[in-house]
Amino acid sequence: LRRAFSIFALVGFFSSLLVHLSTFFGIDPSKHVPWVWVLHLGIFVLFIPMLFVQGLKPKKDFWREIFAAMPRWGRYTIKAFFAYAIINFALFIFLSRGGVPDVRDGKYVLHNHGQVVRELSENEYEWQKAYVIRGFSGHWMVFYLVSAIVFWYRGKSAQF
């Protein structure tokens, strides 16, 4: 069962990676693949059981225990994707100016808590929609990757 969860997580990881990469070409994946947001739900479907495999009791060395059960390449890969997710999120905030793209009164706008930050062209609107997906998918990759590696390498003694 752990291996099945791991494979499911790898499918989620590579799907998230593909979605993420598409946004660099100004593509809004949610426009072409409406179910793309299912990837957001998938991280919870996998990450919560991964926490059970790891043990739910609060631990001071939670991450050290997770990393101890995996090979060195897994630790480095997760750390690299985690660092990328932080940088990606900062870039997302910068590029979106803290706003969300929307259509209001037939106009493309960027708004923040109901306040219009500025009007957008249709092209800018499409890019802003892509930035939103990019902001989320950067985190999806980390959650799927951690789940995949933990499920694959966690010892058989783990309760699940």
Model-derived features with residue positions:
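Juxtamembrane non-transmembrane "cap" segments at the membrane-aqueous interface
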Residues: S96-Q115
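Transmembrane alpha-helical insertion/packing segments
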Residues: L1-L51
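Hydrophobic alpha-helical membrane-insertion segments
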Residues: T77-V100
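Transmembrane alpha-helical segments in integral membrane proteins
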Residues: L51, Y131-F160
